[in-house]
Amino acid sequence: MVEESQFESVRSREQRPHESVDIRSTFESVSVVIPTVREQNFTAESLPDWIEPELATEEGLNIARNRGIERTDGDWIVLVDDDVTFPTRLTAWLIDAMHPLHVAGLEDYWPMNGILGRFMIFHRSLWKHVGGFDESRPHGGDTDFIVRCRNTGGAVVRLPRRLI
């Protein structure tokens, strides 16, 4: 005999769940932060006109990340480098499926098992809980942030680098 839950899973696959994600309404609770020192910002140029990014120009990458996040008010933070085509639809789908203890981003290089700061999504409450990015670190702030997220119970969702 087939249980009801098995029927439900078949139905949900057939319904294409991501088609029902309203991208604009998902982004109502999102802040896009782009640390940058460049005059031309390819990422900002690739954003839909209804997304207003926070350009963080402070000296020091981790300082810029933290100050940019502090100036925003979205529950979800998308931290992204200044030289990519912003994946609007992918970002909305990920956020729609995420829990506040999730951190999603591009997989780090082997043998590391974290994610890169090139594209990273997390909830503001997790960022606050772990104390943000360590501003005393000139390098490796993304790795340190992920380690501290994991140590506090966060789950890391690693995406293939080729996505972005």
Where are these regions (language model features)?
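Conserved donor NDP-sugar-binding/catalytic core segment of glycosyltransferases
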Residues: 85, 91-113
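Short aromatic/hydrophobic "clamp" motif used to bind/position activated sugar donors
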Residues: 77
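Acidic donor-binding loop at a coil-to-helix junction in glycosyltransferase catalytic cores
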Residues: 139-145
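A recurrent flexible, glycine/aromatic-enriched loop bordering the glycosyltransferase active site
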Residues: 105-122, 138
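Conserved nucleotide-sugar donor-binding
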Residues: 73-74, 116-130
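Active-site donor/metal-binding and catalytic loop motifs
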Residues: 159-164
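Glycine-rich, basic loop-to-helix element that forms the pyrophosphate-binding segment
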Residues: 58-72
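N-proximal low-complexity "stem/linker" segments adjacent to membrane-targeting elements
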Residues: 1-50
